[in-house]
């Protein structure tokens, strides 16, 4: 995806909260993972309910009388600051690791708890490599328990239910709160915090077209990638039996759509037909020219059919039989001079639209976070939520604007840089130092175009685009450097080097065979 990919998305699950310590995680977890294993997940995403805090005379937050008192998360130290981070994607995890890396006065080093509904951190820009077979799941989706083994960061696998912030009490001259507030989790846990970080991510927006929610495959999470891989494998087995071409429809020609089309067309080769649909008459409308041109060359060489200037009106089953897995997509022209048409597909991949998981439910109230129309928290330039000096927001949860007044894109590159500033500004706030305003540095954009192909347009050399195997190697190196923790980077680096050596030997053997056979 462009500039790395969008930040972490949370998928509902039925597990209760689990506190993972280093010893427990080592004893009970392994790093193995089967890509073909079934994931039972729903597409209904978690909602963040903002409820009115009931404050008594002493300034503490209480639960409403008609609710059962939740269990309180026990912090190890009652004196040191308490930092609760919601969301374990690029924004949340890297903020936690940044806090861990800073030098603290002994009595001020914060206790950090990270809450996420998944047991794994997902490096989303490389989900495409799961479809091409370039990477293993453990390489791009390590367990939090493994990543946090040698840190003081605690991990809770749970779902956020309610926020009860009380730092708004210190705004506009009112009494200053002695605590930041409380987070209620779906399992019944209550976390009292001094500082809160909102990094809840987003989910695919499938409810804009009839049939998309029920029939289309999003490509946004690890679970999505596994489902798509399983579906493609099923279609490949069917193709092997009857020789029928595999018809793939990709909705959207942004970075995600183009990367998917390039990866799948390479995987299927002459066994499949890939059609990419886009409302604009161009692909990658916001990308550098070099990336767009490189992508067009690859898509053309792999015979990807581009249906540009079309809107998807609806998605329907090809028949009323559940076992019939074909679909019809009704396309309406978004540009003059085009005619409506209906195309058929064996699988529909949806890559357009995302909605933040931070959602405001109450129209008013002193503790309601200020959200924009997209459901993102309004923040100041230090990444603090406006009106809530003890709450920071980043990634998909934040609506920070650049120097030109435009909202920053919700990419992993932005979240990665915001995490660095968020960690530092929490340090500064705890130590009574000035907070730093966030300044985004665009390092460029890169995308995968297949197993040995990619395109990179670095921002520091105008007009330069690295393509083909060189771009592919540079992209993997850049992402290797961005992986969390030195230990994980080392393990993945060794694994990728070994795979590269095996591929090189296989290629050499293939070339020698061709030479010896005279072909």
Swiss-Prot record:
- Classify the protein's membrane topology as the record does: Peripheral membrane protein
- Family the UniProt entry places it in: Belongs to the NADH dehydrogenase family.
Tissue expression, as annotated, is: Flowers, roots, leaves and stems.
Report the transit peptide positions. 1-52
Query: Residues that bind NAD(+), according to the entry?
Result: 246-282
* Top-rank taxon: Eukaryota
Residues annotated as signal peptide: none
* Protein name per the record: Alternative NAD(P)H-ubiquinone oxidoreductase C1, chloroplastic/mitochondrial
Instruction: Give the regulation of activity.
Output: Inhibited by dicumarol.
Source organism = Arabidopsis thaliana (Mouse-ear cress)
What does the note accompanying the cofactor annotation read?
A: Binds 1 FAD per subunit.
Record InterPro entries: FAD/NAD-bd_sf, FAD/NAD-binding_dom, NADH-Q_oxidoreductase
**Which positions does UniProt annotate for FAD binding?**
82-118
What induces the gene encoding this protein?
Up-regulated by high-light.
Pfam families referenced in this protein's UniProt entry, alphabetically: Pyr_redox_2 (PF07992)
The consequence of inactivating this gene is:
No visible phenotype. Increased photosensitivity to high light.
